[in-house]
Amino acid sequence: PAGITTAIAAAREGMNSVILERSEHIGGLPVNGLGATDIATRGATTGLFGEFVALNREYYRQKYGDKSAQFRDCSDGYHFEPSVAAITFETMIRRTGPGKIEVLLLRQFDAQPKYVIKKGEKITSIRVLNRATGLEEYYTGKMFVDATYEGDLGAAAGVPYKLGREGAGEYGEPCAGKIYRWWKHGPDAEGTTYQGDNAVQAYNYRLCLTNNPLNRRDIPKPDNYTRAELVSLIDDV
């Protein structure tokens, strides 16, 4: 969603944008299963995120009514179905006006320096793969925003970066580094070192769950699935 809101903000300032998305739909985590925002200070909600939340709320109010369980459960728009988030983002893009934002799906950027064309330290164009046609495409712009979770464009362009987490002493942060904590309260648990390491945040699936058999969808087993490679994860769970 960072790329979407960046394009919307630019459109409101009179600029045109192209959103290049690797998958078949835009929206990031909110459109792929993360249907509940966990912001604790809702009074701080403003800007484009505030508009996103308000549109979610209005969707449930109009579709189900303000006395409905669905409207109540949407928690003023902070809780939403992924399909509703997709509708909201599409609405926000459409409201910028014709031609302001072009969305191109199935465009893959491969994180290699040769696919970034620069003039000095400034990116002038990038090469992407059209996954639908298998053809290379080049896009030129005055500014490029890497709004992905991985930051591959920045890395390929030579922007310095660091992997891992800092130790507590590096920047004077008492909650940094390797820490094991008891739930809610208590002293730091055994194994705590406060030291940094090269660990990165785990990837996982954000799935929508249901107890309604009519809403269930089977997950097909991938052709390359090998149970032995994953069975050790059971102990972690």
What are these regions (language model features)?
Residues 6, 29, 155-157:
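Short glycine-/acidic-enriched loop or helix-start segments at secondary-structure transitions
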Residues 7, 11:
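Gly/Ala-rich phosphate-binding loop of Rossmann-like dinucleotide-binding domains
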Residues 21-24, 34, 47, 134:
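Residue-level signal for pocket-adjacent positions within structured domains
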Residues 39-237:
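Aromatic-residue-lined binding/catalytic grooves and analogous aromatic/hydrophobic interfacial grooves
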Residues 28-40:
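Short, surface-exposed loop/turn segments at secondary-structure boundaries that line and modulate
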Residues 6, 21-22, 104-106:
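Surface-exposed patches in mature extracellular/periplasmic domains of secreted proteins
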Residues 3:
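N-terminal Rossmann-fold NAD(P) dinucleotide-binding loop
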Residues 12-31:
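Glycine-rich FAD pyrophosphate-binding loop
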